[in-house]
């Protein structure tokens, strides 16, 4: 079972693409290691860091930074964000 639910698409999330970062809504029970492994397996890019936070609505949001340049743009294009 994947810990990734869906990409989090806002204006701020689109600006983070320039910093090679993507945001996802994830399962509230998943930890940073599970999120990192799932994203690397799903998209084939190395993740540099994972930051998580819980929104005011009770959802868990993960901000992922990628090691390869332009990895976030490539993933966003694959999943139809761009």
Swiss-Prot record:
SUPFAM superfamilies: Ribosomal proteins S24e, L23 and L15e (SSF54189)
Annotated Gene3D superfamilies: 3.30.70.330
Record has rRNA-binding as a keyword: yes
Molecular function terms, GO-annotated: rRNA binding; structural constituent of ribosome
Pfam annotation, one family: Ribosomal_L23
GO biological process assignments: translation
Keyword Iron part of the UniProt annotation: no
Swiss-Prot/TrEMBL keywords: Ribonucleoprotein, Ribosomal protein, RNA-binding, rRNA-binding
Gene Ontology CC: ribonucleoprotein complex; ribosome
Protein's job: Binds to 23S rRNA. One of the proteins that surrounds the polypeptide exit tunnel on the outside of the ribosome.
Subunit structure: Part of the 50S ribosomal subunit. Contacts protein L29.
NCBIfam families from the UniProt entry: PRK14548.1 (NF011118), uL23_arch (TIGR03636)
Homology family: Belongs to the universal ribosomal protein uL23 family.
Protein name per UniProt: Large ribosomal subunit protein uL23
Encoding gene per record: rpl23
């Amino acid at each position: 079972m994947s810990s990734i639910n869906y990409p989090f698409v806002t204006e701020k999330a689109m600006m983070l693409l320039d910093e090679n970062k993507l945001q996802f809504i994830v399962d509230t029970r998943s930890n940073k290691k599970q999120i990192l492994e799932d994203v690397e397996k799903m998209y084939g890019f190395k993740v540099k860091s994972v930051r998580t936070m819980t929104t005011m609505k009770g959802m868990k949001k993960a901000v992922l930074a990628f090691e390869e340049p332009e990895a976030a743009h490539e993933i966003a294009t694959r999943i139809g964000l761009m």
